[in-house]
Design a protein with these regions (language model features):
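Glycine-rich phosphate/adenosyl-contacting loop at the front of the ribokinase-like
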Residues: 1-58, 63-67, 74, 229-230, ...
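Hydrophobic anchor at the start of a short beta-strand
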Residues: 2, 53, 79-80, 157, ...
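Conserved N-terminal subdomain of the carbohydrate kinase-like
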Residues: 22-26, 33, 48-130, 284-290
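Small-residue (primarily alanine) positions within well-ordered alpha-helices
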Residues: 43, 150, 185, 256, ...
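Gly/Ala-rich phosphate-binding loop of Rossmann-like dinucleotide-binding domains
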Residues: 47-48, 151, 248
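Conserved beta-alpha-beta core of the PfkB/ribokinase-like small-molecule kinase fold
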Residues: 131-193, 209-211
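Conserved phosphate-binding/catalytic region of the ribokinase-like
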Residues: 166, 194-290
Length: 290
């Protein structure tokens, strides 16, 4: 079982010719909604590949929240531990697209209602996990409580440190793997809590160049296949979900990274954060064709 503890957002996306000036109203050319949030994105990526996935998080007791839970169930994800809250709305991301650029306002909403006490009540679900995957779009004290129980139960953890925040003192020892991008990795290694011995906990994503990690003192690079990219939005989340899935299947770190890099590469060939996330059959076909 893969347990994902993280965010669930509804993306509200508008397209205009240019960004409005303060106080100005513009007529947009397109509006659409999509399911997002790093936590849910990564859960979907793992489930599409055939993983047994449960989601832990919060949504509002509102139409967005109800719609999201229905969608996740259709993706085969267990949502019994996603808590609807009545006093706060489902998390949203307001995205304006103009001339190839974007402007984004994230309203965490219900995502910040997942508290350490909730994790304590759900520790039985954590104990059944093969691996636990987290991000930093929820409260830090909640993430810390998940790490506490994971360490107590001897369960491997993956922390995707995005959006970036410095890793608090004491966390490094509890985390199995961190999956920063290049910029996040640079900041992590300059932080006061980083030690050289933690280098082998880092699996660094390099965008279209693939990924790199260190094992037994060696730097190991995993190159990415060349693809025609349509939308890179969900590549990082696909990588994390795939990594968790293949590690839970018992693959070595190197093999799991190789599969995750290929899954992320394939995901960018279709639009949408979740739209391009491949199934296991699609990924196998893609890799065999290489």
């Amino acid at each position: 079982m893969i347990t994902v503890v993280g965010s669930l957002n509804i993306d509200l996306i508008s397209t205009v010719d240019r960004f409005p000036k303060p106080g100005e109203t513009l007529i947009g050319s397109e509006f659409r909604t999509s399911f997002g949030g790093k936590g849910a994105n990564q859960a979907v990526a793992a489930a599409r590949l055939g993983g047994s996935v449960q989601m832990i998080g919060c949504v509002g007791d509102d139409p967005f929240g109800h719609e999201y839970l229905t969608y996740l169930k259709k993706e085969g994800i267990l949502v019994d531990r996603v808590k609807p809250v009545t006093h706060v709305s489902t998390g949203t991301a307001l995205i304006v697209l103009a001339q190839g650029e974007n402007s984004i306002i994230v309203v965490p909403g219900a995502n910040f209602q997942l508290a350490p006490e909730d994790i304590d009540r759900m520790k039985d679900a954590l104990e059944k996990s093969d691996i636990i995957l987290m991000q930093l779009e929820t409260r830090l004290d909640t993430v810390e409580r998940v790490l506490f129980w994971a360490e107590r139960f001897g369960i491997r953890t993956i922390l995707n440190p995005a959006p970036f925040q410095p890793i608090p003192d004491g966390w490094w020892e509890m985390i199995t793997y961190l999956t920063p991008n290049e910029h996040e990795a640079e900041a992590l290694m300059k932080s006061a809590t980083f030690k050289e011995e933690f280098l082998e906990k880092l699996i660094i994503t390099l965008g279209k160049k693939g990924a790199v990690y260190h094992e037994k003192g060696r730097k190991i690079e995993i190159p990415a296949p060349q693809v025609d990219a349509a939308d890179t939005t969900g590549a990082g989340d696909t990588f994390n979900g795939a990594l968790a899935h293949f590690l839970s299947e018992g693959l070595s770190l190197g093999e799991a990274c190789r599969y995750a890099v290929h899954a992320a590469s394939l995901s960018v060939t279709k639009p949408g954060a979740q739209g391009g996330m491949p199934t296991r059959a699609q990924l196998e076909s893609f890799m065999n064709g290489r």
